[in-house]
Amino acid sequence: MQTAHSVAQVREHVRGWHRKGQSVGFVPTMGNLHDGHISLVREARTRCDVVVVSIFVNPTQFGPNEDFDRYPRTLDADAAALVEAGADLLFAPSVEEMYPLGQNQTWVDVDQLGDHLCGASREGHFRGVTTVVSKLLNIVQPDVAIFGEKDFQQLAILRRMCEELLFPVKIVGAATSRETDGLARSSRNGFLSESERTLAPQLYAHLQQVKTEIIGGERNYRALESRTSQSLNSTGFSVDYITIANARTLAPAGPDDTDLIVAVAAKLGSTRLIDNISLAVVRDR
């Protein structure tokens, strides 16, 4: 595996691959890699001739009171894991390389889809995500880009962005990677204390219970959200939202919606966790 720190270096590699007719898979990350990230790299490996992984902790997707400064930077360990996973190129740029004119110049913003769920409480977050991903796609020029379904809203927004801006890339969503107790793998799990880590799987357990109730015929979604939020709060979480949403629009679902996503964001101590579960329901007659 080779490592590049500049846009020019990546583009030189990409031109060489394209001349050979090789397909390029891309996995963008913020580093501190875990088994979930590695599963994305391996998915890209099965789909493409060469695989590029980026590691960049993007400042523009963090709010002023969020965890940008303490987000783990583990580049050496990450590089070793990527060699083992079969990546061909690691792109690890500086902030100055990605934002040469500063961080408040040109933005890419996807309306509506970013207004719900995490977007309602993390103003500017998805604008930062779409801006940096559009830059990365422009640099890497991949045929396929792999994202985890744990960040379902992000995945939906990036698919919309690529469709509307005519990026010649296939966006692939990979199933959420979980620990054996059901907790969705996340770099932020390392912030959890021992007691918080023991409690954390309850987030997914509550999502499963919501899914069971909907399959069983519950259609009063707002009441179900309220009950679930109260249960999580009483368990020790501080719930930001739990929403039963239309999987296409991400707006709160109604009884006539058939493709649903149940999404949750909650804090344990100072650590913010997100998760989701999808389901299809038969419309009531």
UniProtKB/Swiss-Prot annotation:
What is the top EC class of this enzyme, as a single word? ligase
Cystine residue pairs: none
Q: Tell me the residue numbers annotated for binding ATP.
A: 30-37, 148-151, 185-188
* Gene that this sequence comes from: panC
Report quaternary structure and partners.
Answer: Homodimer.
Q: Name one GO molecular function term.
A: ATP binding
- Gene3D superfamilies of this UniProt entry? HUPs (3.40.50.620), Pantoate-beta-alanine ligase, C-terminal domain (3.30.1300.10)
Species of provenance: Alcanivorax borkumensis (strain ATCC 700651 / DSM 11573 / NCIMB 13689 / SK2)
Q: Can you name this protein?
A: Pantothenate synthetase
Could you share any additional remarks the record makes about this protein?
The reaction proceeds by a bi uni uni bi ping pong mechanism.
Q: What keywords sit in the KW lines? A: ATP-binding, Cytoplasm, Ligase, Nucleotide-binding, Pantothenate biosynthesis
Q: What is the lineage of its organism?
A: Bacteria, Pseudomonadati, Pseudomonadota, Gammaproteobacteria, Oceanospirillales
Return the EC number: 6.3.2.1
Functional note: Catalyzes the condensation of pantoate with beta-alanine in an ATP-dependent reaction via a pantoyl-adenylate intermediate.
Q: What is its main location?
A: cytoplasm
| Pathway of action | Cofactor biosynthesis; (R)-pantothenate biosynthesis; (R)-pantothenate from (R)-pantoate and beta-alanine: step 1/1
What residues form the catalytic site here?
A: 37
Q: Which residues bind (R)-pantoate?
A: 61, 154
According to UniProt, the reaction catalysed is:
(R)-pantoate + beta-alanine + ATP = (R)-pantothenate + AMP + diphosphate + H(+)
| UniProt xrefs under InterPro entries | Cyt_trans-like, Pantoate_ligase, Pantoate_ligase_C, Rossmann-like_a/b/a_fold
Record localization: Cytoplasm
- GO cellular component terms? cytosol
**Which terms does the UniProt entry file under GO BP?**
pantothenate biosynthetic process
Say which family it is in.
Answer: Belongs to the pantothenate synthetase family.
Residues reported in the UniProt entry to bind beta-alanine: 61
